[in-house]
Amino acid sequence: ITLGKPGEEAFLEMQAEHGIVSKGAKVVADEKVENGYMVSNLCGGLGELLFDTIEAPEDGDYSLTIVFRKGGLKRKFLVCLVNDEKEYDCYFPSSKGFTPDGRLQIVINLKKGLNTLKFYNPVASRMDSAQRQYTNMGRELQRATREFAEKNGTPEKPICYSLCEWGMNQPWKWG
């Protein structure tokens, strides 16, 4: 990973072996990646990668670049949890062949001083995926109604948000 202020050169680079792996994740040798090592098993509710020595010079937004190796037509998902507070969803695009040096960039917010970044994929089942997607949709509906009310000077109107799915993902357990 690399970190820098948006539009500026990166000031920090951390390799796979600088992180702490747990819950099944491993640092493995791979001659196809730039420094020769990568982290595997960060999928399907398995594995975590933690960088706990991320030093930011000031509070604010930073560009986080994740260098990845993947292959296949399926998109991949990963969560970046910053300081055990804010989650950032990362969606890795599909590719027709193996990509040893793909890059995904997101903007994250860091505080001045020491920060932690934890990478993991909490989606181990269809139910996990549905719960995350519906939670995100509910949060965005709340944001949209709040913004509309503020923009138009009107009271915020409630939205009835109903989950069904014909029971496929058991929404009564998490909805």
Ranges and model annotations:
Residues 3-126:
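Extracytoplasmic
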Residues 4-8, 125-175:
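Active-site neighborhood of glycoside hydrolase catalytic domains
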